[in-house]
Amino acid sequence: LLNRTTRRVTVTADGAAYYDRTVRLLTDLDDIEASMTNARANPRGRLRIDVGTSVAQLLIIPHLAEFHARYPDIQVDLGVSDRTVDLIGDNVDCVIRGGELSDQSLVARRIGNLEFITVAAPAYLERKGTPTHPLEIEEKHASVIYFSPQSGRNYPLEFRRGDESIDITGPYQLSVNESNAYVTSIVAGLGIGQITSWQAQQ
């Protein structure tokens, strides 16, 4: 690449070509780094998210205008259902769900805690009275139960106080597998149920 004599050093033709090529590569690398920095500062593209119906209605959709104002180049495809999705098979980037992670090959991050409260419609309580203990629900009242869209398994009403734990599975007048329909059923006076505190605030 270099010609050396006792008095001077000159660049060979191959050396000059090597230098020119290296300068172009370094310039290209600088351009790539600049574009990546810009991409991080201004993310763009399509984002496929799947969330439960109540989460979509009460937590996600009300904040999408603010999200798009901050990230105008992101296109959101929002799937809304209470069923479990296959991230790979359904080509979904992100899922927001409550509960335990069933697939240990997935990466999960806790984004909050859900507080469930026991509720009933005023009309139901006027008709049936207000229970003073969870066992009264099983003995004297009707409950509205949520069941899994996948397995069909009923989720009990769960009561915890210290070391005491009571699960109520019935009797129920209605079992529902969609969260908005579940809340509507309770509001309609069909029985006692458990919903999140932010659902109750609505």
Give a label for each model feature.
Residues 8, 46, 113-114:
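Short acidic-rich active-site patches of cyclic nucleotide enzymes
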Residues 10-38:
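Alpha-helical "hinge/linker" immediately C-terminal to small N-terminal DNA-binding modules
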Residues 44-107:
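Central regulatory/effector-binding core of bacterial HTH transcription factors
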Residues 85-91, 101-202:
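C-terminal regulatory
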Residues 1-11:
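A short LG(V/I)-centered, amphipathic sequence patch enriched
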Residues 5, 51, 81, 120-121, ...:
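A secondary-structure boundary/capping signal
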